[in-house]
Swiss-Prot record:
It is found in: Cytoplasm. The active site is at C108 (nucleophile), C206 (cysteine persulfide intermediate). Pfam families: tRNA_Me_trans, tRNA_Me_trans_C, tRNA_Me_trans_M. Gene3D superfamilies: Adenine nucleotide alpha hydrolases-like domains, HUPs, Translation factors. HAMAP family: tRNA_thiouridyl_MnmA. ATP binds at A10, M11, S12, G13, G14, V15, D16, S17, M36, G132. This is tRNA-specific 2-thiouridylase MnmA. GO terms for cellular component: cytoplasm.
Length: 368
């Protein structure tokens, strides 16, 4: 069946998705704009209506609608409250209660934007979805596969968040901004009088007011947030923590203990509700084991390959080797020890600008 040129653009009200919609319209696509209404706590609904900054606030809806009207495309607000809670919020809560540190944006991309949003697009008889992500998709005729690449603007590249996309999802996705710099995108918005050229990039967890995830967890699952011991690696008690959900690997501030030297969270023992602290050297690992693997250029990896990996959104890439580990897991071995490998975070594998794939960090391997 021939693909049509109708595309559903996820419009947050920000400059990137606004310009993406404009570009596609100018390229001859039949563009429909849509804003995703996500879940908030009842007490945060008023903040949703008042918040002028948030990517998912009512103000953002108004901005997206104004842009859609300006460029002359239909616009819908789609209700994703239930699936967002089921796939993103529940996972966020569960991961923290297990002593892990999740990245809800990766879960949102995987289960909401490229699962539920794609379903809505098909219901609207669209053959593509599009977003304002700074990444590129190329079809490789030799491999007969869609490939994902880092965007031209390496300071805004978002491929780390996209490494869970499948071949079926990549085939139905357009990234109009992949070959542009952020400054160019802002200039395009200004030249076309979209009214969003100067909007700042969103930094917060969209469903957590003020990015205070500790307060959020305390309010939604107070029965699971309990104080417990702070221990050293030998099991000696050094103090008491407020609840493991308030801490992450590598954290130094806010531990509430004074030992005459800096100490860091080096492990979280959720089974015993204990926080393990140690010196900075104890934060370093020689590798990690990743689960929930998705590979893009290959069906599977059979032998060790040289890669670079990214273990959190704002971290530098690390030269490594990648090899099978069994049970649908992969082993990453760093060429040099790496600090604060954090279970629950996403890990993305690269060769130059090509995204090999990604997964979720299960655990660090040998501490240095």
């Amino acid at each position: 069946m021939m693909m049509s040129n109708r595309v559903l653009v996820a419009m947050s009200g920000g400059v990137d998705s606004s310009v993406a919609a404009l570009m596609l319209k100018e390229q001859g696509y039949e563009v429909i704009g849509a804003h995703m209404r996500i879940w908030y706590r009842e007490e945060d609904e008023e903040l949703y209506e008042q918040n002028v900054k948030g990517c998912c606030s009512l103000a953002a809806v108004h901005d997206a609608k104004r842009v859609a009207d300006k460029i002359g495309i239909p616009f819908y607000v789609l209700n994703f409250k239930e699936p967002f809670y089921d796939w993103v919020v529940k996972n966020f809560i569960d991961e923290y209660l297990q002593g892990r540190t999740p990245n809800p944006c990766i879960a949102c991309n995987r289960f909401i934007k490229w699962e539920e949003f794609l379903k809505r697009a098909m219901a609207l008889e669209c053959d593509y979805i599009a977003t304002g992500h700074y990444s590129k998709i190329v079809y490789d005729n030799l491999k007969n596969r869609y490939l994902l690449y880092r965007g031209k603007d390496k300071t805004k590249d978002q491929s780390y968040m996209l490494s869970q996309l499948t071949q079926e999802q990549l085939a139905r996705t357009l990234f109009p901004l992949g070959d542009y710099y952020k400054e160019d995108v802002r200039n395009i918005a200004e030249q076309n009088e979209l009214g969003v050229a100067d909007k700042p990039d969103s930094q917060e967890i969209c469903f957590v007011p003020n990015n205070d995830y500790g307060e959020f967890l305390q309010s939604v699952v107070p029965e699971h947030i309990n104080p417990g011991p702070i221990l050293d690696a030998q099991g000696n008690k050094l103090g008491e923590h407020k609840g493991i959900a308030f801490y992450t690997i590598g954290q130094r501030r806010g531990l509430g203990i004074s030992l005459g030297r800096p100490v860091y969270v080096i492990d979280i023992d959720a089974d015993n509700n204990a926080l393990i602290v140690g010196d900075k050297e104890e934060l370093y690992s020689d590798g990690l084991i990743a689960e929930e693997i998705n590979l893009i250029p290959y069906e599977q990896i059979e032998n060790s390959i040289d890669i670079e990996c990214k273990i959190r959104y704002n971290s530098r890439n690390v030269s490594s080797t990648l090899q099978p580990y069994g049970n649908d897991q992969l082993l990453v071995k760093f060429n040099q020890p790496v600090e604060a490998v954090t279970p629950g975070q996403g890990v993305t594998f690269y060769q130059d600008d090509l995204v090999i794939g990604g997964g979720t960090i299960l655990k660090a391997t040998t501490k240095k």
